[in-house]
């Protein structure tokens, strides 16, 4: 007799149960996040479906309970296109850095996605400020030109965690020295607190 247990730990199941998906990417515009996605995985497919259908009811329920549901978007460098292992390694490193700095109780990662232009890390946060501060700290150590947090609410504006595009333009126009930047602008903090 094989000793096979059908008992399942619900917490373990939720922690490790991911649904992989593929889709046809659409042209991404400046106001539409995630339409460039062609592959991803998620632990909460209903949240992704609601976002793509522009239905904020689920996100509203989370927000009413003090939970922020969103994702970090960042551009994929040209040299990483088609290199799924390197893309996943970066996402894993970002998750580890956020967890280490913000704490395990601050966030639960739901999965991520790869698009034609951007990578995405999906999560729900109980302490959004700690999560975004941790992400911003990690991202400033990378060479990425920008990274943003966006709620799973399509009509919301992004909160930029990193934006070197202005620095680059300023440096090209004024001086060869890079400009210093703060992690979150006062406007971004107000938006985050309103969530």
Predicted regions span which residues?
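Charge-rich, low-complexity segments
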Residues: 1-117, 126-136, 140-174, 183-191
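Short cationic amphipathic helices and targeting signals
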Residues: 119-124, 195
């Amino acid at each position: 007799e094989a000793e096979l247990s059908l008992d399942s730990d619900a917490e373990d199941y939720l922690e490790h149960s991911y649904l992989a998906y593929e889709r046809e990417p659409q042209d991404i515009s400046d106001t539409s996040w995630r339409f460039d996605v062609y592959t991803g995985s998620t632990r909460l497919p209903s949240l992704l479906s609601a976002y793509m259908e522009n239905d904020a009811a689920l996100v509203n329920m989370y927000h009413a309970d003090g939970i922020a549901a969103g994702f970090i978007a960042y551009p994929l460098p040209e040299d990483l296109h088609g290199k799924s292992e390197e893309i996943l390694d970066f996402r894993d490193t970002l998750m580890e850095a956020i967890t280490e700095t913000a704490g395990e109780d601050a966030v639960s990662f739901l999965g991520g996605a790869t698009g034609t232009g951007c990578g995405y890390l999906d999560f729900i946060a109980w302490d959004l400020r700690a999560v975004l501060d941790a992400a911003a700290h990690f991202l400033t150590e990378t060479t990425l030109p920008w990274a943003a947090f966006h709620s799973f609410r399509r009509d919301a504006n992004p909160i930029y965690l990193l934006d070197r595009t202005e620095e680059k333009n300023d440096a090209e126009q004024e001086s060869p020295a890079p400009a210093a930047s703060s992690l979150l602008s006062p406007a971004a903090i107000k938006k985050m607190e309103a969530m």
